[in-house]
Amino acid sequence: MRAACRCETPRACMIFARSAHTISERMKREEMDAVRRALPVPQRVMAVVLSALFVLCPLAAYAAGEEADAVPLPIIMYHEVKPDKSGKDAIQPWELESDLRWLAENGYTTVVMADVIAYVRDGTPLPEKPIVLSFDDGYYNNYVYVLPLLRQYAARIVFSLLGRNTDDFTEWPSESIDYAHVTWAQLNEMLASGLVEVQNHSYDLHAYTSERHGCMQNRGESDAAYTELLRADLQRLQDELAEYTGRTPDTFAYPYGKYGDLTDTVLRGMGFQATLSCDWGINRLTRDSACLYRLRRICRSHGQPLSAALERAYRAAG
């Protein structure tokens, strides 16, 4: 038979019960500690390891499960598309058409960075075989040769712009296939198609000289000076894009693929939700927003079929 409670009030009874439970739990811990101390050293170490595994294994299983559910995302990096000259950073129009036809025949769907970010941050579904086609620098030949092919194949691209070049060629227009860049009017025509997403490639940091390598911090340059320079450059293009197109980029493509730890800190502080690098490989998208930074890309060069480049990248990714 249970003994009658001798507490003067129900509240006192509750406090007494909680205290008894706390004392009981403490005694259990002390007993377990005593058992562990009584064990020989090797067994004592093993007991600690096993205790840790009870905590870590569920976390590892969760991480492994998330990785298993990761979505493979190839991002192809293009630059110029023109009929006469070709090389590492320039392919011919028939090569791009071959890429678009092959992708359509093999079940790929082109997506843009808004789709990628929405999947990672909000869980918005992606198509079964997503792929990003990114075009850097804002060349006029992209307007001439790429846009018609996008319309023909209903494909979408990410178009990363250099602000100063667009300003210059808006003021002094040129139809040179070899060196001209798009004007603001041409960019707006591309955006109006619904097939082009514009992103930030810097206003005027696309240079690789003794003075600076892309948007990298120089040796000996103070963090404050570098932060001010980078923010001012990128914000200028953000402001111009908002003014001339009504768009605000959320992705930054590193000029020449150069970056540092402070670069990413500044970019995140400015609200950029993703970055495109020149590191080679296939990306694996999870629901962790960290996977959106320094996204890998596969450079599409003349004479190297996209199908072969993708096969090699998938094989390397395992």
Predicted regions and their residues:
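Substrate-binding cleft of extracellular glycoside hydrolase catalytic domains
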Residues: D115-V116, E128, V132-N141, Y153-A155
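A cross-kingdom marker for long, charged
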Residues: Y259-L262, V266, A274, D279-R312
